[in-house]
Amino acid sequence: MIKEYYGAETFILNKDFAYILVIGTTDVSLIPGLTIAGATPELTHFTPAADAEYVLLGKCKSINTIPVSPTGIPTPALLTRASLSFINPLKIVVNAGSRILPKIPYIDLQGEPGKDIRKQALSMEKVNNIIENSIKLGEELSNEYELIMIGESIPAGTTTAMATLLALGYDAMDKVSSASPDNPKELKRKVVEEALRNLPTDPLQRLAKVSDPVLLGVAGTSLGFKGKILLAGGTQMTAAAAIINEFDKNKLKDITIGTTKWIVEDKFADMLSLAKQVGVKVLASMLDLSISAYEGIRAYEKGYVKEGVGAGGSAIMALVKGVSNNTLVRKIDELYGELVGSSNLHI
């Protein structure tokens, strides 16, 4: 049910944990054709806030239904909420820089929304704010927990992740995943190549140029935390791990990426080679959604969405606690059925 890579072990997860969801936006998501993490490019800026609201409340306030792809595939926040319902951990939403603010309690890192990486993603002032404040958050969480799981929500985050990995010297071109089964590699490559022109030499200034607020918030929280960390995400979390490694070469021994089988088996990406380059362990949930009653859920098995909002890590935590695949899928269907019954969501 859970596959282990590069020395990852599930036994470290048998303890109470807090779920941290870091949200933010990047104007890269406004580039047509780059991401399907929203029904239209403009709606992608609502996705992180709506994801956070749904995970905490079971409904969205910023938009009238959960985020969906242009073809109606539901957000992975649905999988996250279903998995966490069996465990009920403390859930904390952290705003690293979201254009739309969630209508729920959250911690603000005093960052800013990411701009177009082809010009300049973030100001140095906001980069420092995000890193310093997230390090402090991680330190405070260490007083109560030995384990935290960090998820992310930022449409177009795989593009900024690829730019970040390349800017830090990794072989990442065309290796990151996509929420679409048709990974828009040529468009991503064109955007990233333009972003990487005339890079500064200082690593922090490079991150300010081509990264995004969420990657910095995830990295900072991890750097401040003293215990074990499950980075719940796909190829984006390899970029977060690369940033962590840039600051502290010893930190990755306490960190594992927890993702989905749809990421590690993605034929149009190579997440495992990225993890190996960075030097971070990987766990993958082998959750099978083909038995779902809903086409929108079964679409995950066809390469749609794949990961996000901590879906893979949350499924791993539920499976570690003894929840069966069938039980988890029934819960996902139950939550999706409630949404279909109360809105114009397509099935």
Swiss-Prot record:
Recall the GO molecular function terms of this protein's record: nicotinate-nucleotide-dimethylbenzimidazole phosphoribosyltransferase activity
- Mind telling me which Pfam families this protein's record contains? DBI_PRT
InterPro entries for this protein = Nict_dMeBzImd_PRibTrfase, Nict_dMeBzImd_PRibTrfase_arc, Nict_dMeBzImd_PRibTrfase_sf
Region forming the signal peptide = none
The record's annotation in Gene3D superfamilies points to: 3.40.50.10210
HAMAP family to which the protein is assigned, alphabetical: UPF0284
Which NCBIfam families does this entry report, sorted A to Z?
nicotinate mononucleotide-dependent phosphoribosyltransferase CobT, PRK04447.1-1, PRK04447.1-3, PRK04447.1-5
Which protein family is named in the record?
A: Belongs to the UPF0284 family.
Q: What is this protein called?
A: UPF0284 protein M1425_0030
